[in-house]
Amino acid sequence: MSIVILNRVSKSKKNYAEWLKESKEKVYLLNHQETVETFEDTNLLRKGFNNFSTNGLVDYEVVEIHRNDPIKALIALEEGEIIRAGYLREYLNIEGQKLNSAMYFRDKYLMKTCLKKQGVRVPAFKKIDNRVDLFEFINQEGYPVLIKPLSSWSSKGIQVLNNEHDLKKCLLKNTFENYMVEKYLDAKVYHVDGLLINNKIVFCCASSYINTPLAYKKNIGFGSVLFEKGNKFADKLIEFVKSSLAKMPLTENMSFHVEVFHEEKSNELFICEMGSRTIGAGTDELIKYSFNLDLDKILTQAQAGVHLDMNIIERNISGQLFIRPQKGFLRHFPEKLPFDWCFIYEKRGILGEYYEGSSEKPTDSYAVVYFEGKTQKKLFERVEILEEYFIENTTWEN
């Protein structure tokens, strides 16, 4: 028997060789060409592919491996590979998340239709097959509305239409192929992340977004901060997510990332989106720091059938802040930070580079800061300190 891994990132981010060191099976790593060399000092059977996500030879290789060395587990942690892995598991009859489950967590229309039918609150929505569908929805629900691709991630391709001017601008260049429209809720956004092992939730935590995932469209700050243990609102979020997940086609072992709206006027919770994967953009570092838990490591070990190296240790809660670029040439920004409550500082900016501001995705940034504190209130106070510090210590030139 064998284990096959579909992977994009480097060994420093996902050390499969270390995670699966107790496995008795051969481990095949099918990897993006750009990062495959980082695994050279491991005993993984490696093969790199250009254009990994669209390269059908990856799928062909999985089938060939299975023919010669039957696959026990097909591991695909990246959101972009979930559907591919679902198809392959279905075709080859491999244990794990099959296509039906994968589709319900990737296709936003299927997801929300499933939840709505079972009484879970979701914003009003409609699949768009043509422009008239969009007109009808706006006539019924009014502005503002969200236009979003059915299977995008990281808020990619989402547009907010506030009025007819926005609608006309959108109509100029959008064919609405594989899109849906949704009523925009003026609500705070939270996320709940966790791990399901052997059909049981073994870990779950709640966090508050700093602003919303669409904040980049206004070039304002974005990030995430955990709730402290015992926070009643966090407990409410977690229970809502657990009951909502129970309505979905789950698989035996999976991580999950669920975004939740809280409408303060009605004090009601709504499901924004669900993903059968670990939260990305480095935000999983908060869980590693505050709980001594690497979700992807434990999920990989569970899928491979080896001992789970899980030892949850609760420390101070933590947060992550993306520092937005302004428009202009970046001339100076902090080399290091003077705060002992910051535990990771990623310098992404390139001095002398011209930036157009932040408009492409939520994680656009020239720096990322990870920081800790005892309460969420303290974390939000530190967000303000960090934002002010970067404004005062960064130089932009037009």
Which residue ranges define each predicted feature?
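Short, flexible turn/loop "capping" segments at secondary-structure junctions
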Residues: P149-S151, K217-N219, S359-D364
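ATP-dependent carboxylate/phosphate-activation module, predominantly the ATP-grasp catalytic core
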Residues: K183-V189, G194-L250, H262-E264, G275-Q303, ...
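ATP-binding N-terminal substructure of ATP-dependent carboxylate-amine bond-forming enzymes
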Residues: M1-N100, V132, V306-L308, P325, ...
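Active-site nucleotide/adenylate-binding loops and adjacent lid/helix of ATP-dependent enzymes
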Residues: R106-D186, I197-N199, S224-A246, E387
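Protein kinase-like catalytic core scaffold
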Residues: V202, F256, E268-E273
